[in-house]
């Protein structure tokens, strides 16, 4: 949890690098809010920055960002899979982030080649099969 909290803090601070002082931050996310709330609470305690979380369907959130344009309240768009990140990049809703911290800590396979998005986590996928029909060597 601490690594995720640190990385989230870095991303948030970098996303607002143009601001001199940050009092409040808005994250549009398709992740489950209950999974983010402990991280956000830690971030708030560590920095004093209030985080507003707007949760919803990824497609709807991207539409909202498109409609809001430059007036979007979203400082960060956080989603659950790389496919949505690709769609968001294609819609050009991301800005390039230049950060030595992210360059050092996020492997190239977990980020956009143009630094428009960075992966926060990765998941293992399992294959379930009938051992009556297949041998594990078949895979």
Question: What are these regions, as identified by a protein language model?
Answer:
Residues 1-24:
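Short, low-complexity disordered leader/linker segments with a strong preference
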Residues 8, 81, 101:
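Residues that line or immediately flank small-molecule/substrate-binding pockets and catalytic motifs
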Residues 11, 32, 133:
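Short, glycine/serine-rich, charged loops/turns that create anion-binding
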Residues 44-45, 90-97:
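Glycine-rich, phosphate-binding/catalytic loops in enzymes
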Residues 72-77, 95-132:
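A structural signal for short loop-to-beta-strand junctions that line the ligand-binding cleft
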Residues 132-139:
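Short helix-loop capping/hinge motifs at secondary-structure junctions, enriched
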């Amino acid at each position: 949890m601490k690594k995720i909290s640190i990385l989230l803090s870095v991303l948030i601070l970098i996303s607002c690098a143009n601001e001199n002082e940050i009092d409040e931050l808005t994250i549009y996310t398709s992740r489950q809010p209950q999974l983010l709330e402990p991280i956000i609470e830690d971030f708030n305690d560590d920095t004093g920055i209030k985080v507003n979380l707007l949760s919803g369907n990824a497609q709807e959130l991207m539409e909202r960002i498109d409609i809001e344009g430059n007036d979007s309240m979203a400082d960060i768009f956080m989603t659950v899979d790389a496919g949505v990140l690709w769609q968001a990049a294609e819609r050009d809703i991301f800005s390039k982030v230049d950060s030595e911290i992210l360059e050092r800590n996020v492997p190239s396979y977990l980020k956009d080649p143009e630094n428009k998005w960075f992966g926060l986590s990765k998941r293992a996928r399992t294959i379930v099969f009938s051992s009556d029909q297949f041998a594990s060597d078949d895979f």
